[in-house]
Every structure is written in C-alpha cells, then in structure tokens.
C-alpha cells in the first residue's frame, strides 16, 4: 500500500523526504501522462504500469493492499503473501530501488503538469 511504499522509499533514499517524490515530473504522485521528464519520472511511470498489471489480479487493489517485507541497510525483500501482495510489494520494491539509482532534479518537482506533460 502507499504507506508501505513510502517506508520503502525512506529505506532506499533516506536523505530525501518521501513527499519530494509525490509531486515530481509527469508520473510521480498523480497518475500521469506524456513523456517522463527524466529517469526518476520513468521509475514512477513503470510503477504506475506495474500497479495497472496488479489490478488485473482478481480483488487486488494496489493502493491499499498490505504486504510483508523486510528492509535491511537499504535492501528490500518481499515475503510470501499471496499473488496480489507479492505483486504489489514487488512493484514498490522495484520502484524504491529505481528511485535510489536515479538523480533527483529539483527543477522537475512541482512542474506545470498541463504544460510539460502532454
């Protein structure tokens, strides 16, 4: 779920507040459209598509589905918990790791969505 995703982000990117990822580029935090503005925004686009796939599992609601995972020194490991939970956890784990690898560009935070995300 989104609360657990926030915690995963904090694990992989501990020096940046999670809310900096909630309104970034064209895909982080609000659905999304257009071309991602950079690699970090592309991480969010991939995460959105991953959630779309998880929603195809009967009864799976990624934004609220809880799952079990472990975090140890920046390493995230999803635990068994059924097909939906495993799928959602993996979406969040992959995205949090992607965030850690991508460069955060302050100019892409809180951009003019209508002008830049066509």
UniProtKB/Swiss-Prot annotation:
Gene3D superfamilies the UniProt entry points to: Phospholipase A2 domain
Protein name per Swiss-Prot or TrEMBL: Basic phospholipase A2 1
Entry's family note: Belongs to the phospholipase A2 family. Group I subfamily. D49 sub-subfamily.
Named cofactor requirement(s): Ca(2+)
GO BP: arachidonate secretion; lipid catabolic process; phospholipid metabolic process
Molecular function terms from GO: calcium ion binding; calcium-dependent phospholipase A2 activity; phospholipid binding
SMART domains: PA2c
Catalytic activity: a 1,2-diacyl-sn-glycero-3-phosphocholine + H2O = a 1-acyl-sn-glycero-3-phosphocholine + a fatty acid + H(+)
Major place of residence: secreted
InterPro entries: PLipase_A2, PLipase_A2_Asp_AS, PLipase_A2_dom, PLipase_A2_dom_sf, PLipase_A2_His_AS
UniProt cofactor note: Binds 1 Ca(2+) ion.
GO cellular component annotations of the record: extracellular region
Record keywords, A-Z: Calcium, Disulfide bond, Hydrolase, Lipid degradation, Lipid metabolism, Metal-binding, Secreted
